[in-house]
Every structure is written in C-alpha cells, then in structure tokens.
Swiss-Prot record:
A molecular-function term among this protein's GO annotations: single-stranded telomeric DNA binding
GO BP terms, alphabetized: negative regulation of telomere maintenance via telomere lengthening; telomere maintenance
A Pfam family matched in the record: POT1PC
InterPro entries tied to this protein: NA-bd_OB-fold (IPR012340), POT1PC (IPR032042)
Protein name: Protection of telomeres homolog 2
Native organism: Caenorhabditis elegans
Length: 251
C-alpha cells in the first residue's frame, strides 16, 4: 500500500459520532472543501464538511457553543469561495456541519490551489482549546510530523471513499442551486451599508460649574440661567460665549 493510500485509508476511519469527543486529541478526517477564508486576525481557515451533523448528540450543544466558527465580524476575505450549492447546504442545515481548521505555516501554501467541492484527506488535526474557545488546528511541520492536506481524485478506487462521496453528493442533490448565494459581505461592503446613528450629545448634569477660555472669571451654575438651564455641554458653552457675563474677579 502506498503512502497516499494509507493517508486515505486513515482519513476514511473518521467517526462522525465521536467528533465532539475529540478534545485535545489528534485525528485524521476525510471531507469535502466548503471554502478557505482569511480572518481579520490573519488566520487561514480551511472549512470542510461531511454532509451530516456530528455526535454524540448529548455533547453537541455544549461543544458548539465554544467551537470557533468564522462570522461576518471575523471574516476578511475568501481565499477559496464556497460553491453556491455547498454554501446553501450549510446555510440550510447549520454551521454545525462545518469543521473549520486553522491552518499554519507550510500547509498554507497549497490552500489557494484547492477548489470548493474538492475531497481532501487531512492528517493530524489537533482539537485544541484556550480558556475562551475551542478550535481545530493543523500545526506546521509538514510531512515530518505526518500532517498535511491531500486532495483525493473523485475517481479514486477505494470503497470507503466512494461510499462517502456518494453520501455527500446525495445531500447536495436535495439543495437548490442559487448562483446568487452570499455567505459573507466584504468588509468594505459592510462599511458602505452601515448607517451611522445620530450622535448624541452628552447630557449636562445639574450642579456642574463650567469655565471657558473666552469667558474669564465666569462661573455658570445651571440654575442661574434666565432662559433655563442648558441641556448639553455644547449648548452651555455656546450660550456662555454669547452672553459674556463676567463676574467680579477675586479680591
């Protein structure tokens, strides 16, 4: 058996029902590429799916609350955009179908050569965690640590691979193709569509005494204004500068 065959063989053994049990462990996985994304923090995320949700069900909600998923707020750009049908499948069934892998160092070199819809065998993915979040990581080091991303030809003659491929394709056949599918907006588009709220002036609290550079020796106590106390700092300063009501300088 060749090294290529061994990589595919190991990835085909991935157990969907034990995914949420992969905590601080390393695993191989066979999957289909959804997309590759660069985040605003510079991470490069290989996003893949297997056509179904993961288990065990009792752990799903708790683990998903902590697992990192790319959002509009963290999205910077697509390195590889999603195929509209695959993107729609995730939109309809939920992001919990995605495995999103933070790819490091030399493994990044080949990401731009992937296409959404490619089948890949990924070796030695690390189910890592911090205090705030959990995420899947493909560390650097390349083949010396038996880590890597291997593209699997669609006609590869391996029974387990072909069965997996058919299952994913069967799910996609149930999804309507939408050529206008959009998952994320580019950050500049978000900025263009953002409507700024009217700025709110800071309210002027009662009992505050203001002094301005243009009104020497002036104290403005809010209750002493003939036309009523000003409502904001800007109004108070404008009215003070216009009135110029000096008080006697201190003796």
């Amino acid at each position: 058996m060749s090294s290529f065959d061994r990589r595919i063989e190991a990835a085909c053994k991935f157990d969907d029902e034990r995914y949420y049990k992969q905590y601080h462990r390393y695993f191989d996985v066979l999957a289909q590429v959804h997309s590759v994304v660069e985040t605003i923090n510079g991470a490069q995320m290989l996003r893949v799916w297997r056509g179904r949700k993961f288990g065990p069900g009792a752990s799903a909600e708790r683990r998903e609350r902590r697992l990192f998923h790319v959002t509009q707020d963290s999205f910077k750009r697509y390195i590889v955009p999603p195929n509209p049908r695959i993107g729609k499948a995730i939109e309809e069934n939920g992001k919990e179908l995605l495995i999103e892998i933070d790819v490091y160092d030399d493994h990044r070199d080949g990401l731009k050569n992937l296409n959404s819809g490619d089948f890949v065998a990924i070796q030695n993915v690390h189910a890592a965690s911090t205090r705030q979040t959990e995420m899947q990581v493909l560390h650097g080091g390349g083949a010396s640590y038996q880590r890597g991303i291997t593209t699997v030809p669609v006609d590869f003659e391996h029974e387990a691979f072909q069965n997996f491929k058919k299952k994913v394709e069967a799910v996609l056949e149930t999804v309507a193709y939408d050529e206008n599918f959009t998952e994320f907006q580019q950050p500049e588009e978000v900025a263009e569509n953002h409507v700024d709220e009217e700025p709110q002036e800071e309210a002027l609290p009662r009992g505050v005494v203001l002094r301005t550079e243009t009104c020497d020796f002036m104290d403005m106590e809010l209750d002493n204004w003939p036309e009523g106390p000003p409502k904001t700092f800007a109004e108070a300063i404008a009215r003070a500068n216009n009135s110029r009501r000096p008080r006697d300088p201190p003796q």
